[in-house]
Amino acid sequence: MLPSLQSLSKKVLAKQCIPVDQYHILKCCGLWWYDGPITFYTYRNKMFIKSTCFSEGIELNTVLMKAAKENNHDLIRLFVEWGADINYGLVCAHSEHTRNLCRELGAKDRLDREYILKIFFDTTRNKTDSNIILCHEMFSNNPNLKHVDDLDLREEIMWELRGLMEITYMLDHDNSFSNMLTKYWYAIAVDYGLKKAIHYFYQKYTHLHRWRLMCALFYNNVFDLHELYEIERVRMDIDEMMHIACIQDYSYSAIYYCFIMGANINQAMFVSIQNYNLGNMFFCIDLGANAFEEGKTLAIQKENYLIADALSLKHYNPVISLLSAVTDPEKINSMLKNYHSKNMVVFLDYERR
């Protein structure tokens, strides 16, 4: 739809840095939301809105969804005139009155499955605290997602969280779609180190404390791991923790932390072999893993002959500098930031001969 002169004027005003003593002008113009001014800006050809409830900035289409959920018709009209896709609003329009307004402004009568999936993943793309919290609020328990077969979205989420979702049997047996979505947002927050979002989920979903611990292990987030294990006292079996840490390759910080806490380093090497993680396997050897014959047998069973050949050598030794019991995440990260396995170098030198 073509923007009115009034909405264009508001857009220009929303781009300005308005002094606090002139905030009454913004209130009169409808540029006020959650006790704060609405600011408009563009970044990399995308339109964003800032307000007190999302100070980091949220894409205009996503903000439209929040306005629709709140039945804020003035802001719906304004955001659409500024260039938002009204179909995003329809996804979160729960009242008939708001749905009718969306259709008056050009929304489709009904969004098909592919379009809803596109909206879902486009909205999730911006990995900030404000956006992930807002995504959770917009999509969780959203009756309009019933238009999408749960299996479609489940399969997409399972693919995005492949490896992590496969071990949820260690946690709980709540496989509801709503619980899966919450786990999805929580995992993104831990993966990207979004502290505000992590705190939000931690306070709101106490039954998912161990899920956060699993995410910290899986995504090699040693800061979150230390906070949960040492400060918040969230507990799991230490060898189960090590198992999760070994699923993704080069998870040195999480593996080291579990090792210092008493995990079996030979079992960690076996998990690394099962997952074809050469980097993790050699790091376990650096930490003292020495069950080479058992590891070689496992590698042959997995038809991973490169690992089997590597474990045939007899020249590996623990790296003494790694054996000091460091649990401070800052020191662990500093120690392992540019770490290269000494024993992997031994193997590579042998291969070059």
UniProtKB/Swiss-Prot annotation:
Coiled-coil region(s): none
A GO BP entry: symbiont-mediated suppression of host toll-like receptor signaling pathway
Signal peptide (from-to): none
Key word S-adenosyl-L-methionine present: no
ANK repeats: 59-88
Keywords, alphabetical: ANK repeat, Host-virus interaction, Inhibition of host innate immune response by virus, Inhibition of host IRF7 by virus, Inhibition of host RLR pathway by virus, Inhibition of host TBK1 by virus, Inhibition of host TLR pathway by virus, Viral immunoevasion
UniProt cross-references to InterPro entries, sorted A to Z: Ankyrin_rpt, ASFV_MGF360
Matches recorded under Pfam families: Ank_3 (PF13606), ASFV_360 (PF01671)
Source organism, top-level taxon: Viruses
Keyword match Lyase: no
Quaternary assembly: Interacts with host TBK1 ad IRF7.
Primary role: Plays a role in virus cell tropism, and may be required for efficient virus replication in macrophages. In addition, inhibits the phosphorylation of host TBK1 and IRF7 and thereby negatively regulates the host cGAS signaling pathway and antagonizes IFN-mediated antiviral activity.
Family membership: Belongs to the asfivirus MGF 360 family.
Protein name, per record: Protein MGF 360-11L
UniProt lineage: Viruses, Varidnaviria, Bamfordvirae, Nucleocytoviricota, Pokkesviricetes
